[in-house]
């Protein structure tokens, strides 16, 4: 591994070098995929609330979100013939989902389901009981659960990380697992509306993108395309530069703003760089933080998408015609710049303007030249008396100037100083290792009760001891302090009394709390495992079923936290048929009408 001082590691670009096919549109990628093979996975017309490649925190959206009229339990059907190859139940993610393999080498995924079709639901329930786990992943062979195109495979829902009823639908390459843009397969979605261009951003690429605030230009739609108002010639003091775009895609008949598919930039008619969101793997998805201006986004200013790649943007969405995809101005003549932004249906919007170098304007504040700068593509090591950080080669996307501070921790259970290394407005790709040396002697019985808190409770890391140091992996810069946690979790009571009366209830809900976070939850009813769901994160829920018949029962709940503190509580409860009391209806007496005296 190398440890170096150079701003750009040339090898970092080797994964980006792809030649352009000048005579063909990149959006003609749809010809690579079978057209009309996959049908609508719903029995209502397809309407998109989100498309492939949409920008999300730390990932691109990997499929289509299909509206279900803001309702649950619509039939979800197989998009083509095949067999169920995998099911999963993932809290705060896909929820209940199905993967179907098809004979043409592709797979489809259907997520946020309320339930599977009856035969599959019954089988999964048996496996959950066998494994004593609600969250589960199961693989199947070709002969287990075959499906036909249009066969109902489940009901739509709002499970997992879903924020409202809808169906998440993906098409994948079965062999590689790459998620593919479903709109390239001729899905029945009408679209003749080009993207809307909002803002253009310009960067000085002689320095790190993290060391500057981009120059912003509002865009205006005009005859023949978009323009930068009142600026026929854009003059700049940058002779090596790049652009980013804020743009959204639109579909007919909806006001939704969706993600764009591609953006490309030309200098004097030569294509310099582009990105295309046609295929992405989940392992590549976090590279979105290299495609956007991450610091601009973290400041709450929205998304800007880089048209040219950052030095260590190793994802495969970029294509460049030179070593780095950057604009170079070697003279003071005006140069024609064209930017095209398109969707997956070949609807394009275009910006044309002249770009001219003029010395002495747009002066950037350079990054201080230092051997201590964090350089992408190299191992970077940061060392202080009681704090260290180790950044692997694939940790960062552009040069970062480290800023560090140390202060006394104020939390009563702190066992180290508070260490601040940059802040979380700088993205981290591959996790870095941080090490902290405690400032106090740790009791032997407390050594396994230590957590490292990042950013005032935003995340808790479980460290391991390395001699006198605590070591942990982290996916973000920020503040770090070591804390001791000897307080066990707290568990709420399901009701009052020695024998809780749950006859009026339809379910039992526990929402345990803890200083370091809940690691495990287990419930037993009359000595047997009882399945609680944990779909949305904090609460564990059991809906009464055949496992809990009417009568008196014994319930035991055991909760463990991140460092191994355990709380166990038991209750007796009773449950009998219950009829809610009838509401009393009060009849209002009609006011008597007094006779009206006639005037004499």
Regions found by a protein language model. Name each.
Residues 244-248, 435-439, 507-513:
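Short edge beta-strand/loop segments characteristic of extracellular beta-sandwich folds
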